From Swiss-Prot:
SUPFAM superfamilies: N-terminal nucleophile aminohydrolases (Ntn hydrolases). The keyword Lipid biosynthesis does not apply. GO terms for molecular function: N4-(beta-N-acetylglucosaminyl)-L-asparaginase activity; peptidase activity. GO terms for cellular component: cytoplasm; lysosome. This is Putative N(4)-(beta-N-acetylglucosaminyl)-L-asparaginase CG1827. InterPro entries: Ntn_hydrolases_N, Peptidase_T2. It comes from Drosophila melanogaster (Fruit fly). Its EC number is 3.5.1.26. The active site is at 243 (nucleophile). GO terms for biological process: protein deglycosylation; proteolysis. It comes from the Eukaryota. Keywords: Autocatalytic cleavage, Disulfide bond, Glycoprotein, Hydrolase, Protease, Signal.
Length: 393
């Protein structure tokens, strides 16, 4: 009897010790692991003990538009953690690029259309409310991104276009002025002197490859339409087809995204690209993250790559894979296009992907910078210098 009692007490003692050990393991602190994307396609650097507070707040934008990023970061830091400043940061950052005429592809005095006029497209999206304000084909108003903000804050609409958008801007206190500069006028005169080459016309006469318009539709058998879809006649590049896309996130993962551009050089009057289109030029959702795009807007807007990138992150993929996915859908149909995509999740992890260039530069400001908050990063492009196999989706 005593032997059985002694054995029972020994078993009870062992069980108590085991329970104590398990409790200690389960309650001990664990290191946090967060992936910080290095900017190289398909690679990540996993850094231990990274917390949201160290990655956020954040400002990230397309291309090496440093001054725009620095200003946006300064504005974001006006409040602790960037709270209530993400909209101001995006609007003022993009506005800085408009004033500086970044690459002559943002703001006034760049990318004249067939009539020699510069028109502007811009958008602001709020990731908390999913509200959007945008303008397209804006004429005679320099502050495109600020007019887009007024559409967001003072109307129930998403987008205003053309002369009506300009009239709205006037009513909101913006002054009308010419967007043509001596440089943009010379650019247009040289283009017309070279028989309006290149241009965006097809299936018209006279032959748009050798002559200016006016053009008339050319009767074309249906078997010829696919042949004439080729876009190789007009070389798309960053100097004639560019956008600033910017994302700002505060420490509570409140997100704004914005874009601004003067569109494609020598475009047909009335053309609107991807920049002011929600889901194409930019998309933001506080629950997931945001994405911004740049490149051949006529192609990219058909596939809503920014929306696709955000939804890919929603499905659990990291930002770098989400950015690549946004481009793969396009490459299934268009192997001759140029474009880039930046994706950021709500915690501040980010990635980028590009196609048709050697590499794509972008600006990042966040507390995670080793040599200061603001840095230039690059990503090597698929289809830039080396041939790659495109996975059909």
């Amino acid at each position: 009897m005593r032997r059985h009692l002694r054995a029972s007490l020994w078993i009870l003692c062992l069980a108590t010790m085991a329970f104590s050990i398990l409790a200690a393991v389960n309650t001990s602190p664990k290191p946090t692991l967060t992936s910080a994307f290095s900017g190289k396609a398909g690679t990540t650097a996993v850094k231990a003990n990274k917390t949201t507070g160290e990655l956020l707040p954040m400002v990230i934008n397309t291309w090496n538009f440093t001054a725009a990023n620095v200003l946006a970061w300064r504005i974001l830091k006006q409040s602790k953690g960037g709270l209530r400043q993400t909209r101001n940061a995006v609007v003022e950052g993009c506005s800085k690029c408009e004033k500086l005429q970044c690459d002559r592809t943002v703001g006034y005095g760049g990318s004249p259309d067939e009539l020699g006029e510069t028109t502007l497209d811009a958008m602001v999206m709020d990731g908390a409310t999913m509200d959007v304000g945008a303008v397209a084909g804006l004429r005679r108003i320099k502050d495109a991104i600020k007019v887009a903000r007024h559409v967001l804050e003072h109307t129930q609409h998403t987008m205003l276009v053309g002369d009506a958008a300009s009239a709205f801007a006037n009513a909101m206190g913006f002054e009308s002025e010419s967007l043509v500069t001596p440089e943009s006028k010379d650019m247009w005169l040289q283009w017309t002197a070279e028989n309006c080459q290149p241009n965006f016309w097809k299936n018209v006469h006279p032959d748009p490859k050798v002559s200016c318009g006016p053009y008339k539709p050319r009767p074309t058998p249906l078997t010829r339409w696919k042949e004439d879809r080729a876009r190789n006649e007009y070389e798309i590049g960053r100097k004639n087809h560019d956008t600033i896309g910017m994302i700002a996130i505060d420490v509570e993962s409140n997100i704004h995204a914005g874009t601004s551009t003067n569109g494609a050089r020598h475009k047909i009057p009335g053309r609107v690209g991807d920049s002011p289109i929600p889901g194409a030029g930019a998309y933001a959702d506080n629950e997931v993250g945001a994405a911004v795009a740049t490149g051949d807007g006529d192609v990219m807007m058909r596939f809503l790559p920014s929306l696709l990138a955000v939804e890919t992150m929603r499905a659990g993929k990291p930002p770098a894979e989400a950015a690549q996915e946004g481009l793969r859908r396009i490459l299934k149909h268009h192997k001759d296009f140029m474009g880039a995509l930046i994706a950021v999740d709500r915690l501040g992890n980010y990635g980028a992907a590009c196609y048709g260039l050697a590499e794509f530069p972008f600006m990042v400001s966040s507390p995670a910078g080793a040599d200061g908050p603001t840095r230039l990063e690059t990503v090597k492009c698929i289809g830039g210098q080396d041939k790659v196999n495109i996975v059909a989706l």
